[in-house]
């Protein structure tokens, strides 16, 4: 991610998050029927990542066919435990939540190639819809390509709701299905072709939204740093790489009989 975005207005129907003095509101996300691959149920055997965090579990399907280097790097690091007990260092409401930097500063990161970055892998079939799992550059642009850092798109459902926005997408060559998906799910279309999308959340988007509305710190000028406060810190306890459907979620196991 190279820049922040102006936050759009929130939908009227929302849920209140417990986020301290600067409480924010998490959106109600309707299920979306779309022919776009990012909204399809994963197929048995598809590679997935299970993020166990201090706020709950997030599951994302990975796309090695479209972003092979990003997926290979992410999977390789996850299997070494690189992401275990790291933090979400950026929680930008209406935009994204970002982690994957073992230093916790947002300026670090690593790769499986002796920290050498990998190039952009922009695939026309993958867009920055809400819930997209994306590779990110280190903050400040010191790195000339991707590394271990990643972010979940947490754009609000109405972020691409205006007819002017949708008309602009059409003029820029987006298909009707892509425009409809952005209109229904929200997203960050201006990041398309600038960052690599390598996965999509299919379970736990409510957890992503909870991450995005935690209390964050302000700098000496009163500007939001988008960094969670110490009391609101979010830990990525572990990232497990497996195949769909994966193990049952903890809540399902606790509620099972026999």
Predicted features, each with a name:
Residues 2-3, 152:
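Residue-level detector of alpha-helical hydrophobic segments embedded in or interacting with membranes
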Residues 19-258:
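Cyclophilin-like peptidyl-prolyl cis-trans isomerases
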Residues 3-22:
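Sec-dependent N-terminal signal peptides of Gram-positive bacterial secreted proteins and lipoproteins
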